[in-house]
Amino acid sequence: MMALLQRVTRARVTVDGATTGEIGTGLLALVCAEQGDTEAEADKLLAKLLKLRVFADEGGRMNRSLQEVGGGLLVVSQFTLAADTSGGNRPSFANAAPADTGRALYEHFVARARAQHGEVATGRFGAMMQVELVNDGPVTIPLRIPPASAA
């Protein structure tokens, strides 16, 4: 399972003109389930995300986690993170989990995030979404927990 994290001062996702999720300071996590992923990979990814030290401490060093700063978490499903662009000019998404598996893992990830962290907002799985953000830094970090079958 993978995520592209962006440290933000604010972020919002809308579907059909209606806001489905919005946060202030925190992390925007674009999340993708890959072929072979299970809840175990989702849990490991979430644990890493919540503890990743990407926020400044008193000295200005990236030394504090999302949990430590009490920031928001906006989780948006994005299967295109699994794109394979090695052949030709059209990306292949064959590495992404099937839609039903992707939805189940996304919902599991969000449920666990809500159980472990205070402020969690989301997009809508499978919808055409517009994501607005102000990237702070900019800080953008890819995370990937490979499926156990690929290890």
UniProtKB/Swiss-Prot annotation:
Annotated EC: 3.1.1.96
Catalytic activity: glycyl-tRNA(Ala) + H2O = tRNA(Ala) + glycine + H(+); a D-aminoacyl-tRNA + H2O = a tRNA + a D-alpha-amino acid + H(+)
Domain of life the protein comes from: Bacteria
Pfam entry (one): Tyr_Deacylase
Cellular component GO terms held in the UniProt record: cytoplasm
Chain ranges for the short sequence motif Gly-cisPro motif, important for rejection of L-amino acids as given in the UniProt record: 137-138
Subcellular localization: Cytoplasm
GO biological process: D-amino acid catabolic process
Molecular functions per Gene Ontology: D-tyrosyl-tRNA(Tyr) deacylase activity; Gly-tRNA(Ala) deacylase activity; Ser(Gly)-tRNA(Ala) hydrolase activity; tRNA binding
Keyword entries, A-Z: Cytoplasm, Hydrolase, RNA-binding, tRNA-binding
Enzyme class per UniProt: hydrolase
InterPro entries documented for this protein: Daa-tRNA_deacyls_DTD, DTD-like_sf
Predominant localisation class: cytoplasm
Assembly behavior: Homodimer.
Function: An aminoacyl-tRNA editing enzyme that deacylates mischarged D-aminoacyl-tRNAs. Also deacylates mischarged glycyl-tRNA(Ala), protecting cells against glycine mischarging by AlaRS. Acts via tRNA-based rather than protein-based catalysis; rejects L-amino acids rather than detecting D-amino acids in the active site. By recycling D-aminoacyl-tRNA to D-amino acids and free tRNA molecules, this enzyme counteracts the toxicity associated with the formation of D-aminoacyl-tRNA entities in vivo and helps enforce protein L-homochirality.
Entry's family note: Belongs to the DTD family.
Domain notes: A Gly-cisPro motif from one monomer fits into the active site of the other monomer to allow specific chiral rejection of L-amino acids.
Protein name: D-aminoacyl-tRNA deacylase
Protein source organism: Azoarcus sp. (strain BH72)
The gene coding this protein: dtd
